[in-house]
């Protein structure tokens, strides 16, 4: 009887270990990568999951994207085409410690910045755009936008969190749409 009990425990433990190996990806090996471009861009479009994003400006003419990636099989498609920087994660990165993307942009006004991520924060550092459309399931949207809050039509939605931005329904070609399910919105403006 005792032998059957131990065999049962061994069988259950083996199934648990094997199912864990099948469900999770092994991302122990990764390295920080850089994507650079001197092509003129006016729009940024990001679709990702489980990644923190920081957008910052610099007095350079070069676009720089810093990110963690596998040395053998890329997790990202990053491209500049028709004036748009597109970043798309092609597979999950569970277990990656330095799981952040830092986008350094030439200092100018952009037409549109759209970022969608599930688990991660979005941080702006003095970025200037006519339109912002950002969505986060579990994370925060924070930082400083270059411009004046009064110039933007603003629509914010937080389900389980707080926002220092309030809806501002005005006639304007400039627009901010921020949607956070579980997290906060804390944005300031330079003017």
Region spans (language model):
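Repetitive beta-strand solenoid architecture
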Residues: 40, 49, 59, 81, ...
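Short, surface-exposed interaction patches in beta-rich subdomains
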Residues: 124-191
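Short, T/G/N/S-enriched strand-turn elements that build extracellular solenoid repeat scaffolds
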Residues: 33-35, 52-57, 75-78, 100-106, ...
């Amino acid at each position: 009887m005792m032998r059957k009990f131990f065999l049962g425990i061994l069988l259950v433990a083996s199934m648990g270990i094997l199912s864990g190996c099948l469900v999770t990806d092994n991302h122990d090996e990764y390295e920080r990568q850089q994507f650079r471009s001197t092509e003129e861009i006016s729009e940024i479009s990001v679709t990702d999951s489980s990644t923190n994003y920081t957008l910052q400006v610099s007095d350079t003419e070069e676009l720089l994207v810093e990110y963690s990636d596998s040395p053998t099989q890329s997790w990202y498609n990053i491209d500049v085409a028709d004036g748009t920087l597109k970043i798309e994660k092609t597979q999950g990165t569970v277990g990656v410690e330095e799981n952040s993307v830092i986008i350094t942009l030439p200092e100018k006004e952009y037409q549109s910045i759209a970022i969608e991520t599930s688990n991660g924060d979005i941080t702006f550092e003095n970025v200037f755009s006519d339109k912002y459309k950002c969505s986060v399931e579990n994370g925060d949207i924070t930082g400083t936008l270059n411009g004046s809050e009064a110039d933007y039509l603003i629509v914010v939605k937080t389900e389980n969190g707080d926002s220092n931005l309030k809806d501002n329904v005005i006639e304007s070609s400039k627009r901010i749409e921020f949607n956070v399910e579980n997290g906060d919105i804390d944005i300031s403006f330079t003017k």
